[in-house]
Amino acid sequence: MKAFVWTLSVLLFLLGSGHCKGGQLKIKKITQRRYPRATDGKEEAKKCSYTFLVPEQKITGPICVNTKGQDAGTIKDMITRMDLENLKDVLSRQKREIDVLQLVVDVDGNIVNEVKLLRKESRNMNSRVTQLYMQLLHEIIRKRDNSLELSQLENKILNVTTEMLKMATRYRELEVKYASLTDLVNNQSVTITVLEEQCLRMFSRQDPHASPPLVQVVPRHSPNSHQYTPGLLGGNEIQRDPGYPRDVMPPPDLPTAPTKSPFKIPAVTFINEGPFKDCQQAKEAGHSASGIYMIKPENSNGLMQLWCENSLDPGGWTVIQKRTDGSVNFFRNWENYKKGFGNIDGEYWLGLDNIYKLSNQDNYKLMIELEDWSEKKVYAEYSSFRLEPESDYYRLRLGTYQGNAGDSMMWHNGKQFTTLDRDKDTYTGNCAHFHKGGWWYNACAHSNLNGVWYRGGHYRSKHQDGIFWAEYRGGSYSLRAVQMMIKPID
């Protein structure tokens, strides 16, 4: 198309040149007619000339030259030097472009090879990633299976522990029945003896001879196989009434024949859910009944069973010590006091190690409830409570006091725990030996809640070894019931 335009421009140029020459002839004739007087020299000088400016066309395509019927002069007139220069420039530029394209093609070839290598490496990498992903997936599945097995094992252990506690509770109920039946048989034996003496007085009319001491037909205390730890120091005879001889029953009044069962089995609530970190968390979870709960402190891997007291408003108290009837001997060694002993639904000591773990997982306060033999209850509460570790012999840390029982515990604040076989008090002797229990003795005690349980209040003893609170009833009065409880500070 460009060649056609260029050819058309050349034709127009040629036509314009011919037309100009013809016009000059016509003008010449006209001027000769108008100015006949002019000389030939002047006329020749007055001839007009016309120059047509045709825009120069750049040749961008091939040039076709037809030499037939044209001579060299005509071709020379048709193709100018500038056109040739332009053609040379075009050819040079195209050559440079071809060289550049050749370089690009070479570079593209290298890039293509690199792309192929990268694609191959990418496929290998994808295969490796897939393999690693499958391995990771298998590992996750295996760990999940192990976690599931561990959870199932923990549930089995929890269920077995629950069954053991149920069996222990049933055994405790049987013990209560056994003790009641034992008392009944012993009372009947005493009654029979008294009746025999009366019969002898009536029918023989002779003075009765002094009868031997009455012994129990059935032992009052059966072995406590469900206690926390064995190994009493001194035996169960320490827990006795001070006024009665050992192994002798007091002569009672003549009883009437019982028509109902003489004993009442205490109702024990056992909570299967948990474990909880303390009784407050169990109460917040909706368990408002007092009973045996499964507890697992945050800084411990072991489980423990203890009594949660919710009858005191607002509830959530964790019981760490309880005295009610003297059925458990508290005159024990260090190992017993460390691990704990007793019956969860009766008298027990939770254990120094367990108390340490509980009191150090949060900020706790302590409340001690005391009951005398007239059934009057008082309390002493301390704003903070915790124990130091065993390396410091479970040193006691207490806060400020409030309550109506008087402060008999601050005397023991900051003191280490003492037992018969580990003396850590400030007295020259062993306070545990004199007070018959384990406690945070100073020199020696203003309170002795792990002492001997005496019946009736005031007792006779060489040493003040009863359960006493000096600021309430004094050191010669043994309290009827005591329980120590802790709870997180509000």
Curated annotation (Swiss-Prot):
Pfam families: Fibrinogen_C. Residues 270-490 form the Fibrinogen C-terminal domain. One of its GO terms (cellular component) is extracellular space. CDD domains: FReD (cd00087). Disulfide bonds join C279-C308, C431-C444. It is found in: Secreted. InterPro entries: FIB_ANG-like, Fibrinogen-like_C, Fibrinogen_a/b/g_C_1, Fibrinogen_a/b/g_C_dom, Fibrinogen_CS. GO terms for biological process: blood coagulation; cell surface receptor protein tyrosine kinase signaling pathway. Transmembrane segments: none annotated. Residues 1-22 form the signal peptide. SMART domains: FBG. Residues 79-167 form a coiled coil. One of its GO terms (molecular function) is signaling receptor binding. Its main location: secreted. It comes from the Eukaryota. Glycans are attached at N159, N187. SUPFAM superfamilies: Fibrinogen C-terminal domain-like. Keywords: Coiled coil, Disulfide bond, Glycoprotein, Secreted, Signal. This is Angiopoietin-related protein 1. It comes from Mus musculus.
